[in-house]
């Protein structure tokens, strides 16, 4: 009889599946890596800010030393940007780290964690890894049904994840809807407001979530430098909450969870408003390029407030996987989302104009092949 290690709720976890890296697709399909277009992981097609590269170069000589465990310089920069005390800030190895720290710090086995259907897969994983009672609330129009999520709260609920904008669907919750929801949540239940794609919001969509943090001791706002700031490979994110919450998160986080290069780059990127402006401008143009093509091809898509678009590529349960494979063979990497309960859909990150054009051409070819085979 084989040994079984660990609790059953850990053994039951299905590992998180990342977007395929370029090197893997090149090996698998015999393609030239330089010709592969990756639009799978919602990365910034502009790359990293030049200011971040300069900051990292200056920090290289210090790599024999451990990083600043408290992240003084980065917390000071975040304090200057948001006006919150440094004690309200927790640094993470990407915002994934913050999302998981919240579950580990706040939820005991058997207690409830609420999240929406079609929301970021890490919410369910974070709940599973602590043995929580995971409650997936059915989506409304591919996004969060906040009324239903509030109604799902029970006396043993300890944590609620809300993404705004949502990944992988791109849906957006207006400020008044989020404010009304926060007012309904009992003070014993912590809300994690995941704003990984906040920097892509249009001016008319923007709201002040930090004002909510000042009002609600049970609110944790998480953000990342992986998306708009172009630092995905460095893994740096942060959470902002009142000190009762951050003290708990900091008790269980790894002491050196954000490396020296990441801290230096994030400080530089945070003040690079011109890079953010260019990123948002490129994203808006790319969104128009992709969605106009989808409309021309007769494809349904979900209006997105992020740097990606969810598009329906067929009606049968194998449509997403089939079209995804056809795209891979042409050297285009996108994200199938069958694991999100959306097997007919693909999530396509917004890239450079030429990358978007290559994706559109490959998608048109893949759809034509599927139609011919039908």
Curated annotation (Swiss-Prot):
Keywords for this protein: Amino-acid biosynthesis, Aminotransferase, Histidine biosynthesis, Pyridoxal phosphate, Transferase
Any one GO biological process: L-histidine biosynthetic process
Stored Pfam families: Aminotran_1_2 (PF00155)
Modified residues (N6-(pyridoxal phosphate)lysine): 227
PROSITE patterns: AA_TRANSFER_CLASS_2
Catalytic activity: L-histidinol phosphate + 2-oxoglutarate = 3-(imidazol-4-yl)-2-oxopropyl phosphate + L-glutamate
Known pathway: Amino-acid biosynthesis; L-histidine biosynthesis; L-histidine from 5-phospho-alpha-D-ribose 1-diphosphate: step 7/9
E.C. number: 2.6.1.9
Cofactor(s) required for function per UniProt: pyridoxal 5'-phosphate
CDD domains with a match to the protein in the record: AAT_like
Gene3D superfamilies: Aspartate Aminotransferase, domain 1 (3.90.1150.10), Type I PLP-dependent aspartate aminotransferase-like (Major domain) (3.40.640.10)
Gene Ontology molecular-function annotations: histidinol-phosphate transaminase activity; pyridoxal phosphate binding
Summary of subunit composition and partner proteins: Homodimer.
Family recorded in the similarity comment: Belongs to the class-II pyridoxal-phosphate-dependent aminotransferase family. Histidinol-phosphate aminotransferase subfamily.
Protein name: Histidinol-phosphate aminotransferase 2
Originating organism: Ralstonia nicotianae (strain ATCC BAA-1114 / GMI1000) (Ralstonia solanacearum)
């Amino acid at each position: 009889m084989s040994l079984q290690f660990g609790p059953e709720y850990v053994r039951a976890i299905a590992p998180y599946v990342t977007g395929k890296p370029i090197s893997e697709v090149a090996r698998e399909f015999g393609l030239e890596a330089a010709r592969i277009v990756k639009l799978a992981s919602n990365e910034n097609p502009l790359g990293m800010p030049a200011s971040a590269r300069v900051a990292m170069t200056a920090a290289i000589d210090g790599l024999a030393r451990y990083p600043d465990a408290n992240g003084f310089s980065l917390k000071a920069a975040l304090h200057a940007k948001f006006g919150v005390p440094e004690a309200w800030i927790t640094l993470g190895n990407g915002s994934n780290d913050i999302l998981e720290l919240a579950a580990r710090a706040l939820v005991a086995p058997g207690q409830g964690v609420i999240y929406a259907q079609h929301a970021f897969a890490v919410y369910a994983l974070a709940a599973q890894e602590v043995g929580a009672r995971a409650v997936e609330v059915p989506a409304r129009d591919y996004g969060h049904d906040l009324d239903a999520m509030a109604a799902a709260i029970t006396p043993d609920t300890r944590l609620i994840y809300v993404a705004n904008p949502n990944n992988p669907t791109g849906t957006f919750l207006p400020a008044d809807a989020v404010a009304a929801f926060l007012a309904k949540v009992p003070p014993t239940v912590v809300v994690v407001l995941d704003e990984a794609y906040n920097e892509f919001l249009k001016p008319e969509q923007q709201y002040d979530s930090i004002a909510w943090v000042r009002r609600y001791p049970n609110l944790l706002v998480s953000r990342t430098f992986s998306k708009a700031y172009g630092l995905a490979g460095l893994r740096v994110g942060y959470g902002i909450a009142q000190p009762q919450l951050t003290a708990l998160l900091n008790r269980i986080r790894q002491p050196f969870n954000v490396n020296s290069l990441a801290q230096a780059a994030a400080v530089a990127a945070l003040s690079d408003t011109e890079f953010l402006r260019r990123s948002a401008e490129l994203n808006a143009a790319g969104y128009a390029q992709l969605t106009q093509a989808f409309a021309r091809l007769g494809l349904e898509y979900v209006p997105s407030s992020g740097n990606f678009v969810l598009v329906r590529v067929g009606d049968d349960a194998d449509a997403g996987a089939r079209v995804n494979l056809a795209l891979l063979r042409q050297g285009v990497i996108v994200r199938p989302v069958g694991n999100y309960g959306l097997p007919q859909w693909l999530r396509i990150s917004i890239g450079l104009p030429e990358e978007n054009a290559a994706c559109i051409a490959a998608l048109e070819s893949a759809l034509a092949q599927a139609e011919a085979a039908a």
